[in-house]
Each structure stands twice: as C-alpha cells, then as structure tokens.
Amino acid sequence: MHLARIELTNFKNYEEVALDFSPGFNCFVGNNGVGKTNILDAVHYLSLTKSFFNNSDSLSIRYGEDYFILKGMFEKDGVEDELFCAFQKQKQKVFKLNGKEYPRMSDHVGRYPVVMLSPADSMLITGGSEERRRFLNRIISQYDPVYLKAHMCYNKALMQRNRVIREGGPDTDSMLEIYDEQMAPEAEIIFRARQTLTENLKPLFSSYYEKISGRAEQVSIRYRSHLGGEDYIAQLASSRSRDHAMQFTTLGIHRDDLVFEIDGHNAKTAASQGQQKSFIVALKLAKFRLISMMNGFAPALLLDDIFDKFDHNRVEEIIRLVGS
C-alpha cells in the first residue's frame, strides 16, 4: 500500500497544498507551527474518515473559511484509488471512493489502514480509560468489520439506554430489559475481539519494548473487563439501582480498560518519562505489526516528532525497527 498524492484545501493552516510521495520513507522538515502535523492528520482523515486529534470536523477548517476538502491517491496491488473527503459547516461530511459516495463512513475503515504515533499518545498512559479503549478500537476496526459494526450498534443502544434512565417513567425497567438484550450479543463480540487482540499484542509489545529501551524490566499489558464470561444481562440487571442513582449505565463493555504495568506496578505512576515514551512507541509498533499481519499488508505509519527525550542509541534503534 502506498499513498502517492494528497491535496488539501482550507484544511487547518493550509489554504491549498498538493504533495506527491515516494514509496518508503517521506520526511517533513520545518520549524514548529508550519503545519507538518496537519499533513499527517490529513492522511489520518483519508484513512479513518476522522481526525486523530479531535472529534469535531469543524476544528479542522481553516480559520475564516466554512469548509475543507481533502483528496488522496492510494495505490495497492497495482490498483489506484482516488479518495475525496469534504466537510462544510452545518452539513454532513462527504466521503467518496473513485467518485462514488460511501453510504456509511464505516464502510471505508480498514481499506487503507493507518497507525499514528504522536506526542499526544502520552494520554494512553496518563489519561483515563477511554483513551485506552479508543486505542483498542482503532486497531480492531481496521481489520475486523464485524467488530466495528458491533461496536457501533452497542454504542447506539447504550445511548438509548442512558436516555431511558435519565427520563425515567413507569416503563423504565421494561425498556431497559429491551436494551440489555440488544447490547448483550454485541458486548460479547467486542469482549472476545479485545481479549484476542490483547493476547496477540503482548509478545509483540514486549519484544519491541526490550529492543527500544535496552533494559531488562518486565512490562505487561492486561485487559480488564466487566464481562469476563459472566452473564452480561444479569450483570446489567443487578446494577440498575446504581444506574438510576448515577443517571447512566455504570457497568458494561464501555467501561473496559487496559492495564499497563512495569515490573508489576502501574506504568502511570511507576514508569519514568523515558520509560513511558518507550512504552508508547513499543505499543504503536506492535499495533503496526499486528495490523500488517491481520490484513496481509502494512498500514501507513505516521511518526510525529517522536524522538524528543530519546538518546541517540534509542533513536537509532527506533529508526532501525521502523526501517525493517
């Protein structure tokens, strides 16, 4: 897979720019603030239909304008595909493949996979559990359309369940039973996929961490879930009184987490800044490797200012790993 060309119009700080890329490595060099990261985010948009950095498309529109347009030319197995993404304020985002609009954005996810490594990834360790769930989702969704559909259906039912809890009424419990039955099979799909991913990710991650850090500390990833083989509908029923008190669904697959440990301690508190940085780079390289294995071809790997706080030896090792 190869991104041959990209065009940006009114995207972030760019009024208009077109870039041609060569196969292999492409490097952007320039002062801070000139827009290097924005080009990477445009590639992320064309791959996953959304920004890496924020959930609002409006934030990607150039100041003073009311729309942006992205175009890209991807090559895979000797076939060229032209991608088109446009967003205008107060309107729906449009995404096209070879001139034909997708009925659903999710239909595009996984066609041209991508892995982004950015300083913002520090939130994987220091942030809340939603950051780590997003990490899981962005991996599995790029090779498993069944998971992506299950995740979307689960979230839709969850939003409706939470609305019923907030609004109350005499039929609340019967309505909750309906949504519980809708959520349970989707939760099972999500749980199994995340569990399998974590097990497959562990050896890749440990190997990359050892090579990058050059140290012998033990690192681990552990998947923590409310499901764990128990009856999901029964769990939801048993938590209803707490749900009513808190005014939202307090238990479920949407509360899952990844636990990152170093020498048996939580990496959030026990790891130094350098160790956390090595942890994140190893995670993302493991993600890159796993998606490559699942899809049979390598995704685009976007590296955004990742060498800060690394010594010369670690920088050389990361470059070697990426090059291999």
Predicted regions and their residues:
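Conserved NTPase motor "head" modules and their coupling/switch loops across ABC/AAA+ ATPases, GTPases
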Residues: 1-31, 171-185, 189-302, 309-324
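Conserved lysine of the Walker
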Residues: 36
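Nucleotide-state sensing region of NTPase/ATPase domains
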Residues: 47-131, 140-143, 147, 202-207, ...
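Intracellular alpha-helical coupling/juxtamembrane segments of multi-pass membrane proteins
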Residues: 60-63, 154, 194
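Helix-to-loop junction immediately C-terminal to a conserved catalytic motif
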Residues: 44
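Short amphipathic alpha-helical interaction patches enriched in hydrophobic/aromatic residues
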Residues: 47, 143-144, 165, 187-194
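Long, charged N-terminal accessory/stalk domains
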Residues: 123-125, 130-177, 181
